[in-house]
Amino acid sequence: MGALSHLRVLDLTRVLAGPWCTQTLADLGAEVIKIERPGVGDDTRHWGPPYANDADGNPTSEAAYYLAVNRNKKSVTLDISTGQGQALVRQLVAGADVLVENYKVGQLLKYGLDYDSLKAIKPDLIYCSITGFGQTGPYASRPGYDFIVQGIGGFMSVTGERDELPGGGPQKGGVAITDLFTGAHATIAILAALAHREQTGEGQWLDIGLLDVQVAMMANMATNYLATGTPPKRWGNAHPNIVPYQVFKVADGWIIVACGNDGQFRKLV
């Protein structure tokens, strides 16, 4: 039994940030019920190739990407645009502890599945909304993919080879780093909300935006700028503060030399 085995989570998320959060909760023991669209399911079910093979080694239509972030979950299909689907979600909410969703701002309000509506059914519900730009502000209504937010949030301005070198220019991370960090932040927020509920009996609405998380991820670069007034730039595989901390080509490939302090450097030389 995991630490969260006494909890039930409704997962109304798709793609990566939300599913990463709910998969973590499932790994910790929570019962996670994933609600998907009939006939389509989560977008990433179709993000292939590669596709998984069945027990006999035959290919399926299930993308490996989907399987990477949806283990340990139960999955049901509901059309939440219908009255019947909405009623079934409300029934599930009555017995749930946490709901996680990543619909565009205001979309669940149209279906009567927003926080205020569901709070009337389950007053101590913890309702976590994951969006590109948060619930308020000039960009709130915009959809936001990881790639877009990496650019807007400054990550691509410090990722990639230096501009003056061949191959220089903005690069996204090799994995969807903003989505993954956002999923982790959402998990932390939910765990904090559960602790708060245990002490007070109160539920709450958690507003998690990819852009907020991406800007927070820039902490050391932002502090360097605040201290010096010099905008951060791309350093390739080098470090903006310490040397040596980079990749070197050698006779049989590549090596990383990383010294985090003068003592390590003295031992190196």
Residue ranges, per PLM feature:
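N-terminal helix-loop segment corresponding to the beta1-alpha1 unit
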Residues: M1-A189, A193-E202, R234
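Acidic, glycine-rich segments within the central catalytic cores of soluble metabolic enzymes
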Residues: I152-V269
